[in-house]
């Protein structure tokens, strides 16, 4: 039983050796494979991994390299066992190696001073306790030091992750930020909130009242100047480096500008804030534009699908019409061909019947002619000859006429495409609308033809009654027919004119005084000036680049679709398209413009189907 108990005590002792103590320092394996001394700052239990983890600070390294590690990365060693020394052992260590002989009396040994092993052991333990207390005091002092200002805590507060800072220090760090994080562990913090740590405040006050000791003056290697071994308190604005007071006064930093670390943090945080603010505004604009661009892309894809469906539908109508006409024409060809073939085949049958009858008569006549018996030859010879003559007359009366029937070339071998095009024009939607001009809207300098199909500019004003529809200053005239639904297409002949306007106007658009022609004012139009300068009258106007000079302009209106398109009607190439939502009736409008020193005297003329 005693041996078992001894084994249990040994196991317990081994477990105690392998325990990890907060505030102690152990060698720790870093993620890069190197090994470095690390202070154990705090512990936590990872429920997901099912293990204890330790938050370590690598001695002499930047606090940003602090991390959570598990026990396997700590190098834990079992301390050597203390061996108690008795008086005999002490004697062996202090006495000369000379062995007493057997004759040496026991009295001499007793007269020698007794060693004091227990006292020495107590002194060793006191020294150990002193060192331990110094280490603990150093760790305690470090725990009472703000990691930002590296001074004892003043009005300490604890943030959500559990780290503590001076209230003024954390306020300076978080000032002007839109998102927050712990300066120690970089953990994100949702709200700018912290809790007053009264316990830590009391401890810091007590530490401040304690006489200064070497432990209290201890600074971590990270916060010391590598050159002068002094605390880093200043920031050099010229070199962008941290320094101590000696650095500031050295020749290396002569005439350099220094700031206290916290002031430098505030200055550069303000600079970053000045950079971040416009960037955040730009980000907001970019995000908005990105969303709008996504909407545009989505709408574009919808338009592609809709346009594809429209094109397919329009061509299906054409295909259907042409297919029906093709089938009808082929049916006519078959019917006419079959009828002619039947006539010729019937004629051939008659010819073959006559041929057989003639062959039979010839055969009988030759057979009678070869008869050698005179009596047999002459018997009923007249009757036989009459039958032969009757057969001859029958053949002659029937007649062997060769029939040569021809298909109608004009129908089946004529200009089929042109014929189909002429028929197609009657079913095309929209077809060419025959437009007329409204004389009640014409400017007094415009002269309309008797048929109201053309207009030209006249130097002399006509005496016309004024009315709300008439243009008083702009040289324009409306069409007499307006559109408030459906799809429509019309054309105007512009010929070799050097200036003109062609477009659409809303019913309520202004007709009096000087008018700005654009969609906002109810006008959708294109114009030509100086013989080669084309524009779409948008707001602002847009210059148009045409590859050829159109002699006819086509205008297409899809009222429900909100579309007004202009074409070069000579080859149906698109010139420009307006998109809008129409709420009232639209009327065509024309302007032949001024004479331009005799270069622009021709009239504008609506095109009608011939």
Swiss-Prot record:
<keyword id="KW-0862">Zinc</keyword>
<feature type="binding site">
    <location>
        <position position="247"/>
    </location>
    <ligand>
        <name>Zn(2+)</name>
    </ligand>
</feature>
<dbReference type="GO" id="GO:0005737">
    <property type="term" value="C:cytoplasm"/>
</dbReference>
<feature type="binding site">
    <location>
        <position position="225"/>
    </location>
    <ligand>
        <name>Zn(2+)</name>
    </ligand>
</feature>
<keyword id="KW-0217">Developmental protein</keyword>
<dbReference type="GO" id="GO:0008270">
    <property type="term" value="F:zinc ion binding"/>
</dbReference>
<dbReference type="InterPro" id="IPR013083">
    <property type="entry name" value="Znf_RING/FYVE/PHD"/>
</dbReference>
<dbReference type="Pfam" id="PF15227">
    <property type="entry name" value="zf-C3HC4_4"/>
</dbReference>
<dbReference type="Pfam" id="PF13765">
    <property type="entry name" value="PRY"/>
</dbReference>
<keyword id="KW-0597">Phosphoprotein</keyword>
<feature type="domain" description="B30.2/SPRY">
    <location>
        <begin position="415"/>
        <end position="610"/>
    </location>
</feature>
<feature type="zinc finger region" description="B box-type">
    <location>
        <begin position="220"/>
        <end position="261"/>
    </location>
</feature>
<dbReference type="GO" id="GO:0005634">
    <property type="term" value="C:nucleus"/>
</dbReference>
<dbReference type="InterPro" id="IPR003877">
    <property type="entry name" value="SPRY_dom"/>
</dbReference>
<feature type="domain" description="Tudor-knot">
    <location>
        <begin position="21"/>
        <end position="75"/>
    </location>
</feature>
<feature type="compositionally biased region" description="Basic and acidic residues">
    <location>
        <begin position="108"/>
        <end position="127"/>
    </location>
</feature>
<dbReference type="InterPro" id="IPR017907">
    <property type="entry name" value="Znf_RING_CS"/>
</dbReference>
<dbReference type="InterPro" id="IPR050143">
    <property type="entry name" value="TRIM/RBCC"/>
</dbReference>
<dbReference type="InterPro" id="IPR025995">
    <property type="entry name" value="Tudor-knot"/>
</dbReference>
<feature type="modified residue" description="Phosphothreonine; by CDK1">
    <location>
        <position position="104"/>
    </location>
</feature>
<feature type="zinc finger region" description="RING-type">
    <location>
        <begin position="146"/>
        <end position="186"/>
    </location>
</feature>
<dbReference type="InterPro" id="IPR043136">
    <property type="entry name" value="B30.2/SPRY_sf"/>
</dbReference>
<feature type="binding site">
    <location>
        <position position="228"/>
    </location>
    <ligand>
        <name>Zn(2+)</name>
    </ligand>
</feature>
<dbReference type="InterPro" id="IPR000953">
    <property type="entry name" value="Chromo/chromo_shadow_dom"/>
</dbReference>
<dbReference type="GO" id="GO:0061630">
    <property type="term" value="F:ubiquitin protein ligase activity"/>
</dbReference>
<dbReference type="InterPro" id="IPR001870">
    <property type="entry name" value="B30.2/SPRY"/>
</dbReference>
<keyword id="KW-0804">Transcription</keyword>
<feature type="region of interest" description="Disordered">
    <location>
        <begin position="79"/>
        <end position="127"/>
    </location>
</feature>
<keyword id="KW-0863">Zinc-finger</keyword>
<dbReference type="Pfam" id="PF11717">
    <property type="entry name" value="Tudor-knot"/>
</dbReference>
<dbReference type="InterPro" id="IPR006574">
    <property type="entry name" value="PRY"/>
</dbReference>
<dbReference type="Pfam" id="PF00622">
    <property type="entry name" value="SPRY"/>
</dbReference>
<keyword id="KW-0175">Coiled coil</keyword>
<keyword id="KW-0238">DNA-binding</keyword>
<comment type="function">
    <text>Transcription factor that determines dorsal-ventral body axis.</text>
</comment>
<dbReference type="Pfam" id="PF00643">
    <property type="entry name" value="zf-B_box"/>
</dbReference>
<feature type="binding site">
    <location>
        <position position="253"/>
    </location>
    <ligand>
        <name>Zn(2+)</name>
    </ligand>
</feature>
<dbReference type="GO" id="GO:0045087">
    <property type="term" value="P:innate immune response"/>
</dbReference>
<dbReference type="InterPro" id="IPR013320">
    <property type="entry name" value="ConA-like_dom_sf"/>
</dbReference>
<keyword id="KW-0539">Nucleus</keyword>
<dbReference type="InterPro" id="IPR000315">
    <property type="entry name" value="Znf_B-box"/>
</dbReference>
<dbReference type="InterPro" id="IPR001841">
    <property type="entry name" value="Znf_RING"/>
</dbReference>
């Amino acid at each position: 039983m005693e041996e078992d108990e001894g084994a249990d005590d040994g196991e317990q002792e081994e477990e105690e050796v392998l325990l990890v103590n907060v505030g102690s320092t152990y060698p720790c394996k870093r993620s890069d494979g190197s090994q470095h001394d690390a202070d154990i700052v705090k512990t936590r239990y990872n429920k997901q991994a099912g293990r204890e983890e330790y938050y370590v600070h690598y001695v002499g390294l930047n606090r940003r390299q602090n991390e959570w590690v598990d026990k396997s990365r700590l190098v834990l060693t079992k301390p050597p066992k203390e061996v108690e020394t008795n008086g005999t052992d002490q004697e062996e260590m202090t006495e000369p190696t000379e062995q007493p002989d057997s004759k040496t009396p026991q009295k001499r040994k007793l007269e020698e001073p007794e060693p004091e092993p227990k006292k020495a052991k107590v002194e060793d333990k006191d020294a150990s306790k002193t060192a331990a207390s110094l280490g603990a005091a150093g760790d305690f002092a470090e725990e009472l030091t703000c990691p930002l200002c590296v001074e004892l805590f003043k009005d300490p507060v604890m943030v959500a992750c559990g780290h503590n800072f001076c209230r003024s220090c954390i306020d300076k760090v978080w000032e002007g930020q839109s998102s927050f994080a712990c300066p120690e562990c970089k953990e994100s913090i949702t709200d700018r909130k912290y809790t007053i740590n009264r316990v830590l405040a009391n401890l810091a006050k007590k530490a401040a009242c304690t006489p200064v000791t070497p432990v209290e003056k201890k600074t971590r290697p990270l916060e010391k100047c590598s050159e002068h071994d002094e605390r880093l308190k200043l920031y050099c604005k010229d070199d962008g480096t941290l320094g101590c007071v000696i650095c500031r006064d050295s020749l290396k930093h002569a005439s350099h500008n220094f700031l206290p670390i916290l002031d430098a943090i505030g200055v550069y945080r303000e600079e970053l804030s000045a950079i971040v603010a416009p960037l955040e505004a730009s980000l907001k604009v970019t995000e908005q534009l990105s969303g709008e661009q996504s909407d545009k892309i989505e709408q574009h894809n919808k338009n592609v699908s809709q346009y594809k469906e429209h094109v397919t539908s329009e061509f299906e109508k054409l295909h259907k019409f042409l297919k029906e006409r093709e089938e009808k024409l082929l049916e006519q060809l078959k019917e006419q061909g079959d009828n002619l073939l039947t006539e010729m085949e019937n004629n051939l049958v008659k010819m073959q019947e006559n041929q057989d009858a003639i062959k039979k008569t010839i055969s009988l006549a030759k057979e009678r002619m070869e008869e050698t018996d005179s009596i047999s030859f002459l018997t009923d010879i007249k009757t036989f000859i009459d039958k032969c003559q009757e057969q001859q007359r029958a053949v002659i009366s029937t007649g062997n006429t060769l029939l040569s029937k021809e298909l109608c070339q004009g129908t089946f071998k004529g200009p089929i495409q042109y014929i189909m095009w002429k028929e197609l024009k009657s079913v095309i939607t929209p077809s060419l609308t025959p437009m007329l001009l409204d004389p009640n809207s014409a400017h007094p300098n415009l002269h309309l033809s008797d048929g109201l199909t053309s207009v030209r500019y006249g130097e002399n004003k006509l005496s016309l009654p004024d009315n709300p529809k008439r243009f008083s200053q702009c040289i324009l005239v409306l069409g007499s027919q307006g559109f408030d639904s459906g799809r429509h297409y019309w054309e105007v002949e512009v010929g070799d004119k050097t200036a003109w306007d062609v477009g659409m106007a809303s019913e309520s658009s202004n007709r009096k005084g000087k008018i700005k022609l654009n969609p906002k004012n109810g006008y959708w139009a294109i114009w030509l000036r100086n013989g080669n300068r084309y524009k779409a009258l948008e707001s602002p106007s847009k210059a148009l680049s045409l590859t050829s000079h159109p002699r006819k302009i086509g205008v297409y209106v899809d009222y429900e679709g909100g579309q007004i398109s202009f074409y070069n009607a000579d080859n149906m190439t698109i010139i420009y398209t307006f998109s809008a939502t129409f709420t009232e009736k639209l009327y065509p409008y024309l302007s032949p413009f001024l004479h331009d020193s005799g270069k622009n005297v021709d009239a504008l003329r609506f095109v009608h189907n011939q």
